[in-house]
Amino acid sequence: MTITKTQRDILGASALRPDGIAKVQGDFSFSSDLHAENMLWGATLRSPHPYARIISVDLSAAWKIAGVECVITADDVPGQLTYGLISEDQPVFAKYFVRYMGEPIAAVAADHPETCRRALAAIQVEYEILEPLTDPERAIDGSHADIHPDGNIIRRQRIVYGDITATAPIVVEGTYDIGMQDQAFLGTESALALPDHDGAGIEVFVATQWLHEDRKQMAKCLGLPEEKVRLVLGGVGGAFGAREDISLQVHTALLALRTKRPVKMQYGREESFFGHVHRHPAQIWMKHHATEDGRIVKIEARMVFDGGAYSSTSSAVLINGVTHTQGPYQCPNAVVDGYATRTNNPPCGAMRGFGVVQACFAHEGQMDKLAAATGIDEVEIRLRNIIHTGDPMITGQVLESVAPVERCIRETAALPMPPEMSSNPHELDLPGGSGLTADRRHIVRGVGWGVSMKNLMYSEGFDDYSTARCTLKNGSVELKFATSEVGQGFVTLAPQIARSILGIDDVTYDTIDTQIGSAGSTSASRQTWMSGGAVDGACRLVRERLFEHVGAVHGIDPLRLGIDDTDIIDTIGNFRISVQEATADLTISETFEYHHRPTEDLDENGQGNCHVAFAFVAHRAVVDVDLELGLVKVVQIATAQDVGRVLNPMSVVGQIEGGIAQGLGLAVMEEIIVKDGKVRNPSFTDYLLPTALDAPQVLISMIEEPDPQAPMGAKGVGEAPCISVTPAIVAAIRNATGKSIDRCPVRPQDICF
């Protein structure tokens, strides 16, 4: 698609990122680049076992190593011993049991990273190795003893809707397995902690998605009032959900407070795999009952999400999964049973798509089975069942969001297909990249579809809000917010909002930290809506006061004033003055807290208005498959996405293309391999990621139907691109091979054998 540049960087323009040039030139300061005078290095000792009782921990040898300044364990935590986003069930340091491979046991601070490594190697831990719980079904059926005082089931949620005895002549069912995906951000976890001179407080620079929630959890563990813990956003090298949970924040701060010196911690790639949560692996069974003309009558489903050792956000991920069972389709009757379990596998939590990725993989596989059973085209079967604004969902909630599902499907279908592979293709166009061993005669093409809906913002009664301040001074504007910039582009959007409302081009933003009210997490596709709403509200308050000032000076009713480009005008008269002139020697500052409409918890039958709003998307995938080698080349992805209103076209395209790449990874290559509770591939050597050679042609149609509930009509676009692209690619592989493949990622052996 073509993106045009407008004259001013206001809403609707493809404004350039303020940090873009620095990042391209290598001048941007990421959190791993931070340094302080007299700084120590910190490091963490981790368990090599997925489940064991700690008999003893001997630190004496570590203390004797020259350069070691501090060694700490659970006994040195001055405040609360556990933390967590929803349930505070995860220890700062394991004291009696380790419940997953990589769980922290101790931390050290020393003069050099190599000294830290020597100190960790010197710590002696005696374990009694226990049988790990690795099968979520054993957590459910009770055949394994509880591995945590809170039990092995984090949450169970049923949905019972309509007539559960309803039947129909066409029945299709399947069991779908979704692998454990890593967020695989390029910038690993890092933080720099600076203790106050009096030891009564601390400042921490950290790459995170939620500054205020980190501060809240840290303060409890440090035994400090929240106002004594200041967090500043360090440059973030990707997030995708993994930075919602605490990782090294408390450890770094504890070491700094104990040594009274700055301490920096930074994970290597392997440690990063153990230091953050991943996407939940899941097994989902679904049965669809439909009429002979393909209309869904009832859905039955059972979902099991493996949450790993601690709860993190598993309960919320489960709710997203079960409430999206139907997908973007009408369903008058449903019975769903969902579990999030504890095991001794790696902890799982937030990742882009947040439970909907797993549900969508299953319901789109079912739609393809339904198409085959009825003899109806894959596109037509979806069109016959699409949900509309005003339709009820299986939770009883009425869909209030603008729901252009039909447009998504039809506009995707209208995008051009790629040309057929030539009889003598370039080797890089063959499955496998270099393709030197590929035989053109064994390569077949397939086409597949995926359609999805994704909730926006937090759900189930969470009091979600965001705060922003706008200060107009001498013809320029400074914005203040705590919105974590993790690459999504809010630092570009916020000034665009201010320019559009105030008619001032000189807009900057202050340090992103906890010196203002919370902005919530940069997740759930919420920041354009929530923090955008806060910036919009603050700027409108400033404009209101500006109009009052101009009206008083020039004798005009403020209600008659408006903004025309960079001028203030009398909307029914001839008065005009530049905003620059009108604001000379003037200071106005306003703070605004934006809340979305309230939601509610689900009841025992899964009924309730638990979500705020939804976005919709369709994907069509074209793949080439080498039947002999089991290799896949994704040739093209076509997509039409419901974006509400496009505020920055270039940013939207970037989000869509990035989401497609992440969904492609889950479809054909990305999976953390866990056996007996142990991660077998904690590196980018063995955990495969899409590269530029794997990137397909991407065709995008942005569907603009502004949502009246949204502050500027815009819906968040971050998560939807990665959800239905995975089932679309897998469907295309099924179409090419004729095999019934109901897992992702698809492995070569799934194709060849």
Stretches found by the model and what they are:
Residues G237-K260, K264-Q266, F490-I497:
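Thiamine diphosphate
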Residues M1-D150, V171, R258:
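Flexible, low-hydrophobicity surface segments
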Residues L81-I86, A119-A122, R215-Q217, F240-I246, ...:
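Short acidic, glycine/serine/threonine-rich loops at helix termini
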Residues P78, D141-L222, I387-S476, Q496, ...:
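Helix-loop-helix junctions that connect adjacent transmembrane helices in secondary transporters/permeases
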Residues P18-A22, A121-L130, T134, Q209, ...:
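Extended active-site and interfacial segments that coordinate phosphate-rich ligands
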Residues A94-F97, P225-E227, L231-L233, L257-G268, ...:
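Conserved catalytic cysteine-centered active-site region
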Residues A74-D75, G223-K228, L257-V263, E292, ...:
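C-terminal catalytic domains of large/alpha subunits in multi-subunit enzymes
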Residues A13, P18-Q25, G151-A191, P281-G365, ...:
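Glycine-rich loop/linker segments at domain edges
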